[in-house]
Amino acid sequence: MKNIFWGFFFLFVNFNLTVNGHILNLLPPFVGCWLLYRGFEELRAESERFYALRPFAVGLGIYTALIWIGDLLGVSTGSWISVLLGIVASAVELYIAWGVIQGLREAEEHRRANLNTAAMYQAWMVLLVTQIAVYAIQLMGLALWSLAAALAVVCILAGLVGIILFLVAVWRSRKLYEVLPPLQEEL
């Protein structure tokens, strides 16, 4: 679970340094994808959902690595294709988070333990709504520039709250998981 938490941390939290059009993200999202992949391997015995999430983590890791390199070299674009690819990447991030919640729900049922998945799901819903709102505003933003800018700020702040809530819920889930006895292999 430690890798799951840190994977989401690297995936959702951005600290960027910008110099002359070159952007250095100090917490590269592809590192988060790699940590998630490792976490999925560790939790594979808890639920097959974790195994099924691995290709999504790999694909998202490749995409975010290419974006990270492009930002570093200053060749990233602000085109419509970038926006559409960003929407797809956000959808994959949300799908991975949803899959983790579902996998942990199965582990809760199997182990008869609370792993804080209800709080994780509520935080995930905040992320889902804010992501949809941000991209909808971004796509219609050219027509209503001043209103769209104000709405985007509100949605981004709500998204930040959602990220914090989700990371706190994953952290609590991690702590609850760590005190569980080792999973017994069924003969």
List each model region and its residues:
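Juxtamembrane "helix-exit" motif on the non-cytosolic side of transmembrane helices
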Residues: N16-V19, I69-T77, A136-L147
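C-terminal transmembrane-bundle signature of multipass membrane proteins
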Residues: A97, V129-L187
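Non-cytosolic membrane-interface motifs at loop->transmembrane helix junctions
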Residues: T77-A89, L147-I156
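Membrane-interfacial loop-to-transmembrane alpha-helix junctions, especially the N-terminal start
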Residues: M1-F5, S47-V58, M120-A123
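Membrane-helix boundary/juxtamembrane motif in polytopic membrane proteins
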Residues: F50, Q102-A133, K175-L187
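Generic alpha-helical transmembrane segments
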Residues: P29-C33, Y63, I67, G86-Q102, ...
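Internal transmembrane alpha-helix with an interfacial aromatic "cap," most often the third helix
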Residues: P29-F56, W68-D71, A97-R111
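N-terminal topogenic module of multi-pass integral membrane proteins
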Residues: M1-G39
